[in-house]
Amino acid sequence: MVTETSFCQRNREFAPIQERGNTVSERETIEVDYLIVGAGAMGMAFADTLLTETDATVAIVDRYGRPGGHWTVAYPFVRLHQPSSFYGVNSRELGTDEVDQDGWNAGLHELASSDEILTYFDQVMRKTLLPSGRVSYFPMSHYDGADPARPDVQRCHSLVSGGEFDIRVRRRTVDATYMNVTVPAMCPPKYEVASGVRLITPNQLPALEQQASHYTVVGAGKTGIDACLWLLQHGVDPSGITWIMPRDSWLLDRAQIQPGPESAASDAESFTARIRAVLESRTVEELFQRLEAGGLLLRLSSDVTPTAYRCATVSRTELEQLRRITDIVRHGRVRRIGADTVELGGATVPARPGTLYIDCTADGLEARPVVPMFSGSRITLQTLVPCQQVFSAAFAAHVEATYEDDAEKNRICVAAPHPNTALDWLRSSAHLDDLLLRWFADRGLLEWCDASRLTKYSIGSLPDELRTALFEGLHAERKQLQQLLAHEDQTVAVAVAVAVAAN
């Protein structure tokens, strides 16, 4: 027997379904305008803006027991790499917008901790979304997909009781899990670990009861950086740390990503310097040299050219601390950690006795195919502004609320693949230029961006002459970036042809 409950009649939290043996005696169905799958940062940002700008009803189904997505399982010492001012949802501030007075982020705006972020998302759910009377929240529940016989009915079940329930969706199902964020605690390492080798995730570092004779951090992304900084902050001598770094990365300077009007002048200078660097460069190598000379990109070692770019952000002081670690292993990815050796893609190196290995190799934001964001009865949340996931989700909700035609929505909301290689800095920058140029044509979009707390890009409020100059600069930069990428592709093609001919 299936019963339907009107949205306004049901409780905000799903009541357990009574089961008899293996048969569900009553399968509940609710009806809403939107189903959002995932209560992580993107799902919450989308829901917040949608509720603010429409009268829609929403169901949120999430596999975790509290809002926050990957933050619920992240290592306890993780912090945002960029200011709290740009994170969360539009309707509620995160943090106090204070400037840190001490530590390795001193002089820069505060970075929320995982505890702060989890508390924040809980408050968003409990004090904003649920009190609206238009949100139904299903924690510890799994989304099973559409009912084959009824495409508008989405099937779900509780991960605790096993009880099944249906959600009839009048408008769209929103996939807020597509970006597939992972942290080390979510998955085992992709390399073999011999018996007796001590390997932990960063989550276990604060639970250490005795020091290790040596520490080896495996992985060089944001998590690897955090693990190295944590060890240094807790007094580990740099000589006691080995850092296995499959690729060096170009890093962003956090000082250049600061909120508030006091940063306006430096923002303008940075933007001008970036455009100048692009326009004056004739090769990709020259461009990165200019970007580094202008302080727009940073690297760990001056004698190693980075081949990766993944939006990792550091302060100059943090970078100085990381440079104290001199035992850096650059021989590709780990294949096997044995008792006496570590086998990597490019070499086998000796292992120090008593080493504690810290696995930081989870992909974070893996490369996902770009798909149309708006398609029939589905919305697939993806990054629009590179490396700004929550703004992208909130922006997508605004577009959904404001425009009627999917073709127009997809023209405005062109997703960007998450950057991976150094060349992706060029691709991401060209993508952002293209987006901003599209948005220039719609004053309403620019004004919405200006009002959003989730982005630095305040363009709509610029005087006409400055906006015109910016428009021209973006056009020129995009064209030059495309030419540099085409030149790089041609260079690679020639090198491959020469190699083939030589064989």
Question: Positions of the model-derived regions?
Answer:
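Extreme N-terminal leader/targeting segments of oxidoreductases
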Residues: 4-33, 52-56, 180-206, 495, ...
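Glycine-rich dinucleotide-binding loop and its adjacent helix/turn
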Residues: 107, 113, 117-120, 172-235, ...
